[in-house]
Amino acid sequence: MLVAAAVAPRQRLCVAFSGGADSTTLLHLLARLRPRFGFDLCAAHVHHALSPNADAWLDFCARQCAALDVAFHPFREQVARDHPAGLEAAAREVRHAALSRVTCDWLVFGHHQDDQAETLLFRLLRGAGVRGAAAMAAIEPGFPGRLRPLLGVRRADIRAFAQAASLEWIEDESNADPRHARNFLRHHVFPLFGEAFPGAVPALARASGHFREADGLLGDLAALDYAACGGSPWLRDRLLMLSDERVRNLLRWRIRQMGCEAPARARLVEAVRQLRATHAPLYLPLGTAACCTYRDRLWLEPQRDGAPEQPLPWRQEPALCWGAGVVRFEPVTGAGIGRGALQRAMDVALVPRWPGLMLRQDSGRPLRSFKNLCQEAGIPAWLRPRLPVLRVDGEAAWIGEIGVAAEFRCGPGEAGLLLVWQR
């Protein structure tokens, strides 16, 4: 697997080291392979403070690493016992957060074939889709990437190897607690499976591989549909020519590409229903993302905070935060807002729109209402309350997505400031 992952000399591998049989075996194997491949090896241990033995486990892991000449990174963390998803989920989140702080090229885990089968069954019982049923990948490229070299090996075989090699490891007493869902499957369900279906674990692990292939194909289909619909923003009518299933697949794929969590299927079903039901502008929350439509366009964006309620005074800063975005004040010549006008003003601040807001875009033309300006600029109604307005001594000098008022526009050759709203 190290060859398949193209692990190169001097790359940094970090083992997620609990001290149990699986991660102990993995650490010893990698320590043996280190001279051959030339990678740097370290280990990270997360002290969850959940067991009275946690301090002893940390000391054990430190001694193991010292004996193997492996750099050791301990993390002492606190786990919320009132986590809504349960103690297991809380500990897992804390563990992943700690491991994310390790500087390395690859995080290496001791997950094995039994873990893969348990993960698949656990997720299916929770109603997982194709992505969830794909369970764990042996190689996940990234920064850092993730490797699971033992994913095709049975738990019993790892134990047998560890015993034959006279390795020492710890036993976490919580792994025997049937109140944890995965432990219940491990100790009560899978033994019954094994009696009736001796090949159940390898078969379930193979099935997860089939789901992973299917998930990849769905991603390929979504990429084709993404391009066929005009990219982002999409052409709304072209998107809605697709079947409901393909629209949901495309939305789910794009949301994940944005780094957001994909919403439940029911939420996507309702979103597609609303998209087909009306041509009116829409803002449809989809978990941490939102589906937006205006006129003939449709796009996705992360859900963002609204505009600040209080004015944000500007005191010559190069940028001011605005909701989840930022307004930048970039020095230019002959464009943007005249710098002199701002320096002479008594009160300069970013504010949200206010009732009766008017702005004149060109000299000799009448003042126009905020609503009319937004309509002409193609700004949907749901976005308008979030637009930043630069107020200068009580007057609107600039509105995000619309532009500068004629009275404040910089003249040719004059020092100006170009305001850029980054959402």
UniProtKB/Swiss-Prot annotation:
It is an enzyme of class 6 (ligase). GO terms for molecular function: ATP binding; tRNA(Ile)-lysidine synthase activity. GO terms for cellular component: cytoplasm. It holds the Pfam family TilS. CDD domains: TilS_N. Keywords: ATP-binding, Cytoplasm, Ligase, Nucleotide-binding, tRNA processing. GO terms for biological process: tRNA modification. ATP binds at residues 18-23. SMART domains: TilS_C (SM00977). It catalyses: cytidine(34) in tRNA(Ile2) + L-lysine + ATP = lysidine(34) in tRNA(Ile2) + AMP + diphosphate + H(+). It comes from the Bacteria. InterPro entries: Lysidine-tRNA-synth_C, Rossmann-like_a/b/a_fold, TilS/TtcA_N, tRNA_Ile_lys_synt, tRNA_Ile_lys_synt_N, tRNA_Ile_lys_synt_subst-bd. It is found in: Cytoplasm. Its EC number is 6.3.4.19. Belongs to the tRNA(Ile)-lysidine synthase family. NCBIfam families: lysidine_TilS_N. Ligates lysine onto the cytidine present at position 34 of the AUA codon-specific tRNA(Ile) that contains the anticodon CAU, in an ATP-dependent manner. Cytidine is converted to lysidine, thus changing the amino acid specificity of the tRNA from methionine to isoleucine. The N-terminal region contains the highly conserved SGGXDS motif, predicted to be a P-loop motif involved in ATP binding. This is tRNA(Ile)-lysidine synthase. It comes from Aromatoleum aromaticum (strain DSM 19018 / LMG 30748 / EbN1). The gene is tilS.
